[in-house]
A protein has these predicted regions:
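Short, Lys/Arg-enriched N-terminal segments with co-localized hydrophobic residues
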Residues: 1-14
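Structured beta-strand/loop patches that form or line metal/cofactor-binding pockets in enzymes
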Residues: 56-85
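Rossmann-like adenosine-cofactor binding region
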Residues: 279-377, 382
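Flexible, glycine/charged-enriched surface loops at secondary-structure junctions
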Residues: 34-37, 55-60, 133, 170-179, ...
Length: 459
């Protein structure tokens, strides 16, 4: 498989032979894992300026070790549907790196899930978690189970079957899963219940994203979407601007998208789009957030239902929301959703800022186009780190048997996102590429993990 090496992530840096060799080794070991190879290549490309200045980071096969998971777990998940028929899905947990703390990363339930996607997400999670300055390593898990159109009973039975295998691999100081696509508060509850039954322990910190009534953290539900918007606002602050009066386009209509819309509206922006796999809605007057929440969170219906109740909005079937005039784009759906053609359309429609709410939603071609057009671009490992940062805050509350107010948790989230932004920007400036947030995020995250690995020896 051939993956073109793009120049979007660097300013005049040629990928060093050392890094090219590492990538070739990764590609030879994982020849069919395109998502994982894409994520690995993006990080390795960004490290050329670092290794040119500090070549010791290539010693003792550090790069080879950081690109190979510490542990990959794959297992069958048999469960019984409402018709009494046994179904079998595949479960995954990739425990990628624990140099900074216990493995931390979400569980994704979606029919497209495979080992490549889980490894790409876990690899990104290493550096995302490092950027938060919290004591957490990187991991990811999930299953090809599709919760769409499943009954509550079927989802409960699947979660119980999934945890029956997963429980032996996780723990408050070992590996702490959370939610992701297809895994919300309901699923976390079922997973925790089965863990508690099997172990006969109430280890609140073994999962995050719990209901606030039994160990969850206020502001955790909002954190990923809020964080992406806070990061975008910090990017605008570098130009003495903010989101007040700006037009914002959002993709997705799940948890991340909904709370990105909410935070953007609170900061004075007009959000005009949202989407799902069937198409997107354009509401030129501004999204009615309460209506959207009713449709997606209560009724679990398609976004097309929105226009039936708000006639001034328009639904575009099987299209994406990137051909709409906008100042700020927040891709919050899934990986590689925003292509080169989408990026061209956004640039032609006045785009200034991209802040990724999803994980790797922009293709390399899209990022290259943004770079050439001087559009400021924030990669998900930095801009959507608010979710895992607040998960770490939930772990802190569980460990101390405390429960913080929403205001306290949100204030900590705001501080963390500003620090991540400033650290990325300062690192990019240190390597003579101002506002290259991709380079800044990758180098900053990598050095924190690499330094810990060096200190702890070859293990």
């Amino acid at each position: 498989m051939f993956i073109k090496i793009f120049s979007a992530f660097r300013k005049g840096w040629k990928m060093l032979p050392t890094l090219e060799l590492v990538y070739e080794k990764v590609k030879n070991r994982n020849p069919y894992e395109k998502e994982y190879l894409q994520a690995t290549l993006e990080v390795l490309e960004s490290l050329s300026p670092l290794l040119k200045k500090y070549p010791e980071y290539a010693d003792d096969s550090l790069l080879e070790r950081i690109t190979e998971p510490e542990r990959q777990i794959m297992f069958r998940v048999p469960w019984v549907d409402d018709n009494g028929k046994v179904q079998v899905n595949r479960g995954y947990r990739v425990e990628f790196n624990s140099a900074l703390g216990p493995y931390k990363g979400g569980l994704r339930f979606h029919p497209t899930v495979n080992l490549s996607i889980i490894k790409f997400l876990g690899f990104e999670q290493i550096f995302k978690n490092a950027l938060t300055n919290q004591a957490i390593g990187g991991g990811k898990g999930g299953s090809d189970f599709d919760p769409h159109k499943k009954s509550n009973g079927e989802i409960m039975r699947f979660c119980q079957a999934f945890m029956t295998e997963l429980y032996r691999h996780i723990g408050e100081n070992t590996d702490v899963p959370a939610g992701d696509i297809g895994v919300g508060g309901r699923e976390i509850g079922y997973l925790f219940g089965q863990y508690r039954k099997i172990t006969n322990r109430f280890d609140a910190g073994v999962l995050t994203g719990k209901n606030i009534h039994w160990g969850g953290s206020l502001a955790r539900t909002e954190a990923t979407g809020y964080g992406a918007v806070l990061f975008a606002n910090s990017m605008l602050h570098t130009e003495n601007k903010d989101l007040e009066g700006k037009t914002v386009t959002v993709s997705g209509s799940g948890n991340v998208a909904i709370y990105a819309i909410e935070k953007a509206q609170k900061l004075g922006a007009k959000v005009v789009t949202f989407s799902d796999s069937s198409g997107f809605v354009h509401d030129e007057k501004g999204v009615d957030l309460q209506l959207l929440k009713q449709i997606k969170e209560v009724e679990r219906a398609r976004v097309s239902e929105y226009v039936a109740r708000r006639p001034e909005a328009v639904f575009y079937s099987n299209q994406k929301p990137w051909n709409v005039p906008t100042d700020v784009a927040l891709p919050c759906a899934t990986q590689n959703e925003l292509t080169g053609d989408d990026a061209k359309a956004l640039v032609n429609n006045g785009l200034q800022i991209v802040s990724e709410g999803a994980n790797m939603p922009s293709t390399p071609e899209a990022i290259e186009i943004f770079k050439k057009a001087n559009v400021k671009f924030a990669p998900g490992k930095a801009s959507n780190a608010g979710g895992v940062a607040t998960s770490a805050l939930e772990m802190q509350q569980n460990a101390s048997r405390e429960k913080w107010s929403f205001e306290k948790a949100e204030a900590k989230l705001t501080d963390i996102m500003k620090t991540i932004h400033d650290d990325c920007m300062q690192t990019a400036e240190e390597f003579d590429d101002p506002f290259n947030y991709v380079l800044g995020a990758n180098i900053q995250g990598f050095t924190r993990v690499a330094n810990a690995m060096i200190d702890q020896g070859i293990i």
